[in-house]
Design a protein with these regions (language model features):
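Ribokinase/PfkB-type carbohydrate-kinase core domain
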Residues: 2-13, 24-25, 47-53, 58-146
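A short, glycine/small-residue-rich beta-strand->loop->alpha-helix junction that serves as a flexible
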Residues: 17-28
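Conserved beta-strand positions in the Rossmann-like core of class I SAM-dependent methyltransferases
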Residues: 44
Length: 146
C-alpha cells in the first residue's frame, strides 16, 4: 500500500494548562503531525524548534519509524501558551525572536500550513491548505510571496 505524503509547516509550542493540569509540547503544527502519523501518513515537518522541543518530537517519531522527517529552524526558547482551562484564551508571554522565514519549494507536494508566531513561512507547492491562526488580523497566504 502506498503511504500518503504531506508536508506540514506550523508552530511547536509549550502548552501549560491549570485546570486540568497539563504541560505538553504541541501547537497546531505538532498536533497535526501527531494526528497524521497515527493515520499512517508520511510527514515532512518544518517548524521553529528549541533543543527541548526537537527532542520531544524525535521521541514521538520513534513510535513511527520511517514516517517523519523533521526540518528544524532553531530557536533558543519555545513560546509558551498558558491556559486557565482548555478552551480558554491563552496568555502568551512577550517574546522576541529574530528568525528568517521558513522557505519550502516542493511543487509536487501537498502542504498543510499554519500561521506561526515566530515568522511567516514562504511555501510553493502543488496543493496548499492554509490556516492563518490569527483571530484579529489574518494574513492572506500570498502576502509573503507564497
Amino acid at each position: 500500500m502506498h503511504q500518503q505524503q504531506i508536508s506540514i509547516i506550523g508552530g511547536t509550542y509549550v502548552e501549560h494548562c491549570t485546570l486540568p493540569q497539563w504541560y505538553e509540547t504541541y501547537g497546531s503544527g505538532s498536533r497535526a503531525v501527531s494526528t497524521l502519523l497515527a493515520l499512517g501518513c508520511k510527514v515532512d515537518f518544518y517548524s521553529y524548534l528549541s533543543v527541548e522541543s526537537e527532542a520531544i518530537l524525535n521521541a514521538r517519531a520513534y513510535a513511527h519509524p520511517d514516517q517523519l522527517n523533521i526540518y528544524v529552524t532553531p530557536i533558543e526558547q519555545s513560546v509558551v501558551f498558558d491556559y486557565l482551562y482548555p478552551l480558554g484564551i491563552p496568555s502568551i508571554p512577550k517574546f522576541s525572536i529574530d528568525v528568517t522565514p521558513i522557505h519550502v519549494n516542493k511543487d509536487s507536494y501537498n502542504f498543510l500550513v499554519f500561521g506561526m508566531l515566530e515568522a511567516d513561512a514562504i511555501i510553493h507547492g502543488n496543493k496548499v491548505v492554509y490556516d492563518p491562526q490569527h483571530p484579529d488580523a489574518p494574513k492572506f497566504f500570498y502576502e509573503n510571496g507564497s
